[in-house]
Swiss-Prot record:
Keywords: Decarboxylase, Lyase, Magnesium, Metal-binding, Polyamine biosynthesis, Pyridoxal phosphate, Spermidine biosynthesis. InterPro entries: Ala_racemase/Decarboxylase_C, Arg_decarb_HB, Arg_decarbox_C, Arg_decrbxlase, De-COase2_CS, De-COase2_N, Orn/DAP/Arg_de-COase, PLP-binding_barrel. The modification N6-(pyridoxal phosphate)lysine is found at K101. Its EC number is 4.1.1.19. It catalyses: L-arginine + H(+) = agmatine + CO2. GO terms for biological process: arginine catabolic process; putrescine biosynthetic process from arginine; spermidine biosynthetic process. Its cofactor is Mg(2+); pyridoxal 5'-phosphate. Belongs to the Orn/Lys/Arg decarboxylase class-II family. SpeA subfamily. Catalyzes the biosynthesis of agmatine from arginine. Substrate binds at V284, D285, V286, G287, G288, G289, L290, G291, V292, D293, Y294. This is Biosynthetic arginine decarboxylase. Pathway: Amine and polyamine biosynthesis; agmatine biosynthesis; agmatine from L-arginine: step 1/1.
Length: 633
């Protein structure tokens, strides 16, 4: 263990596999980020960014955004599809469309929209009226593509049609049969020719947590018969030329490339059949699904993906290209809506640990000779454990059973508090000793070794709300890479479980990337008593902010963009302070002015002097204007 280095920590946290080349650990044991792939030697030490923010008055938790990572991800996506098009001889174009539901923050949309400005090959997708109004205002270039998905009313459709007058290329994707008539009515009323798309309900499905997005039971999309009816309706009105886009979506975060291959093949058949029917489809939108390898395991796990970005692009381009070559069809423009893959890496939540409860050996002596037999039996098990060739599993099972009997007898009044405490400490010592003696290589020991690793892990209390900042970790068991930001040049001699500061037992992180797998505890170095430990939650740039809730009235955290300047130095900009207590109370219709009035009335009690009244009111005002999370004094 004395030869431990940062390279060892890199392997434990599996950074090279989930970090996509952006994150690293330097020789000093500090986590770094290289956000700009065109300048790989320009690194930012994340803890330095936190210290600079602290000096300006911002305490953790803080969400750090790296706009250069967004730009790098856009470049990577275009490069992957560009290379696939070139290698396959595909004769159509590729268009990246960002679905803003993934992260609707204005700065995120602006950065993505402006990161590929050589020609309008980067569009936006909206799934609701508010999102549509947002994307109509964000796109400034003539001919910018906007894809309109989701359920629609007439107002939504009117906004989409009017977007064409603003110079955009707006596709209205019909997701249920009744939407077509509304599109036709509103387009006639406004005298604007609609660009219509249709979402096909594929039989193919993707496996994973979002597999219900595909298949015959999908919430969205038209069946084969409904698509035929739509085609005939447009043909009868001599408006078949309005149907220009074919769309499908297998679901978010597809882990298995074979699911994507199956969906592309089925979509290709829909494209060829629509062309055979005389429909001038010239755009195929393959939707989302491009996975992010949160675990770094390159597997079919729900939080991983067994393929690379280039492999995904190759399968999409070759799959559609094969259909075009087979049936001598024109090559459509390919659209992908890869929002998660674009945004996940760009955001890191950083917070501090405010305390920890460790499990240590207790100094305990043998029970008195007249102690109850149950306690004598427990002590004998402890002695057996320290003898020659102990039966480890049997000793553990006996200790667990004995402790259960102790609790029962204590409740019945047969044991006193001191005896119960003695039994708990002895059982804890037994577990600690067993943990060191078990051999995980031994299959018979493996389950107990895992159980004790979790049972004896430190409880680490982190200054954040899981429900606000990592809602998918709580709601669907999503895995996010987590690691301390400093001290990683030291041996990872501790195991911890991160718990948030909400009053909810669900508020803890249950899954941690550990090597090429996922464990229930987090490897951590030993920190000195006065040493601040910052922890980073990585790949949180997709969905987490907008899905977060206000459990215990913990709101949005502080946020800042961390960029590279022209010299490759750190440049912090666009700092947004998190919710104050005053703002959070207003969210739930509690009027702070009423609180102030009530305080004024309460402190007017004659038993309080003027100085005390003023102190109470001053503290109230500081509290209302303060950060909802724990702050340094």
């Amino acid at each position: 263990m004395t030869n431990w280095s940062s390279k060892d920590s890199l392997k434990v946290y599996n950074v090279p596999y989930w970090g996509a080349g952006f994150f690293n650990i330097n020789d000093a044991g500090h986590v770094t980020v290289a956000p700009d792939k065109s300048r790989p030697d320009a690194h930012i030490v994340i803890s330095d960014a936190i210290e600079q923010l602290r000096q300006s008055g911002l305490t953790t938790p803080v969400l750090l955004r790296f706009p250069d990572i967004l730009k790098s991800r856009v470049d990577a996506l275009f490069n992957a599809f560009g290379q696939a098009i070139e290698k396959s001889g595909y004769e159509g174009d590729y268009l990246c469309v960002y679905p803003i539901k993934v992260n609707q923050q204005s700065r995120v949309i602006e950065t993505i929209s402006q990161s590929y400005s050589d020609k309008p090959r980067l569009g936006l997708e909206a799934g609701s009226k508010p999102e549509l109004l947002a994307v109509l205002s964000h796109h400034h270039e003539q001919g910018s593509v906007i894809v309109c998905n989701g359920y629609k009313d007439r107002e939504y459709i009117r906004h989409a049609l009017l977007g064409n007058l603003m110079g955009h290329k707006v596709y209205i994707v019909v997701e249920k049969p009744s939407e077509l008539e509304m599109v036709l009515d509103e387009s006639a009323r406004l005298n604007i020719k609609p660009n219509i798309g249709v979402r096909a309900k594929l039989a193919s499905t993707g496996s994973g947590m979002w597999e219900s997005s595909g298949g015959s039971m999908s919430k969205f999309g038209l069946s084969a018969s409904q698509i035929l009816a739509l085609v005939e309706r447009l043909r009868s009105l001599d408006k078949l030329d309005c149907l220009q886009l074919l769309h499908f979506h297998l679901g978010s975060q597809i882990a298995n490339i074979r699911d994507i291959q199956g969906g592309i093949r089925e979509c290709g058949r829909f494209y060829s059949e629509l062309r055979r029917l005389g429909v001038p489809i010239d755009v195929v939108d393959v939707g989302g699904g491009l996975g992010v390898d949160y675990e770094g395991t390159r597997s079919q796990s729900h939080c991983s993906a067994n393929y690379s970005l280039s492999e995904y692009a190759n399968n999409v381009v070759w799959g559609i290209g094969d259909v075009c070559r087979e049936f001598d069809l024109p090559y459509p423009t390919i659209i992908s809506e890869s929002g998660r893959a674009l945004t996940a890496h760009h955001a890191v939540l950083v917070t501090n640990l405010i305390g920890a409860e460790g499990v240590e050996m207790s100094d305990i002596s043998a029970p008195d000779e007249d102690a109850p037999t149950l306690l004598q039996n427990m002590w004998q098990g402890w002695l057996d454990l320290r003898g020659e060739d102990p039966s480890l599993l049997e000793i553990f099972h006996d200790s667990v059973a004995d402790l259960g009997d102790v609790n029962t007898q204590y409740t019945m009044g047969l044991l006193n508090l001191e005896q119960r405490a003695w039994a708990e400490m002895l059982h804890q010592n037994t577990c600690l000793a067993l943990k060191e003696m078990l051999n995980p290589v031994n299959r018979n020991h493996r389950a107990l070794a895992d159980e004790l690793s979790e049972k004896l892990a430190d409880k680490c209390f982190a200054n954040f709300s899981l429900f606000q900042s990592l809602p998918d970790a709580w709601g669907i068991g999503q895995v996010f890479p987590v690691m301390p930001l400093t001290g990683l040049d030291r041996p990872l001699s501790r195991r911890g479980i991160l718990m948030d500061i909400t009053c909810d037992s669900d508020g803890q992180v249950e899954h941690y990337v550990d090597g090429l797998g996922v464990e229930s505890t987090l490897p951590m170095p030993q920190y000195e008593e006065n040493e601040v430990c910052y922890v980073g939650f990585f790949l949180v740039g997709a969905y987490q902010e907008i899905l977060g809730d206000l459990h215990n009235l913990f709101g949005d955290t502080h946020c800042a963009e961390v960029c590279l300047d022209e010299e490759g130095k750190m440049d912090i900009r666009n700092v947004v302070r998190g919710d104050t207590v005053d703002q959070l109370l207003r969210y739930v219709n509690i009027d702070p002015s009423v609180i102030r009035e009530n305080y004024q009335r309460i402190v007017s009690h004659p038993a309080l002097d003027d100085a005390t009244r003023k102190a109470l009111l001053d503290e109230l005002e500081l509290g209302l204007q303060g950060y909802a999370y724990l702050e340094d004094e």
